[in-house]
Amino acid sequence: MHRQILPTALLRLIDELGSLPGVSPRTAERYAYHLLRASDKKSHTLADSLAKLHTQVSTCPITFALIDFDEQYSKLYTDESRNKQLVALVEEPLDIVALEKTGQFNGTYHVLGGAISPIDGVGPEQLHIPELIERIKNDTVTELIIATNASVEGESTALFLQKYLQDAGVEVEMSRLARGIPVGVDLEYADQITLSHALDGRRKL
């Protein structure tokens, strides 16, 4: 009933904000009202940033990390000071940010693009696994840290990859982040100290 007293444009914004992960209806209302009260310049800046998301953000064809549209490859991949023979395998691009904040990892990354989840219609064929095998060969990768989330889907993906790579005859040492990360917690939400300990205590598979 209360929606009927709000302007249509404001309701549309509330609905759009409310569709974002982790944004409750009440939070969406607060955000929308804040934007309404903000200056035109701030609103236009936000709108411009949103409009440029799909035109100025690209994906690295090797690591599948997010890059600027005018870049060819990820800076973390082309940085010669980083060890290309050590690869951390993550589900999503934001997981890279979480691991980088620890300051403990000097290898490179490979983004799977998700985790195996039959209920969501995500199978191995939807993930960047063939490209991973190609990277292992081309960069002579010696260790693969499987840093998928500590969730049912993340664990299933880790087990699948271990068996898949072994069956494919891919010779690479595989390890898994230590159990410092609570079950059910996504990598991007883990604190830096916990992630640092998880990296240091990773176990061979």
Where are these regions (language model features)?
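Extended, structured, electrostatic nucleic-acid-contact surfaces
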Residues: M1-P21
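Conserved phosphate/pyrophosphate-binding and hydrolysis machinery centered on Walker-type P-loop NTPases
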Residues: R3, P21, D40, L53, ...
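Short Cys/His-rich Zn2+-coordinating modules
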Residues: A9-E16, A38-C60, E71
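Extended interfacial segments that mediate partner engagement and assembly in macromolecular machines
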Residues: A28, D79-I145
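Long C-terminal interaction/binding lobes of large macromolecular proteins
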Residues: S39, T102, I133-L205
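Cys/His-rich short segments
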Residues: S49-I96
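Conserved nucleotide-binding/hydrolysis micro-motifs of P-loop NTPases
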Residues: D68, S81, P93-I96, A115-P118, ...
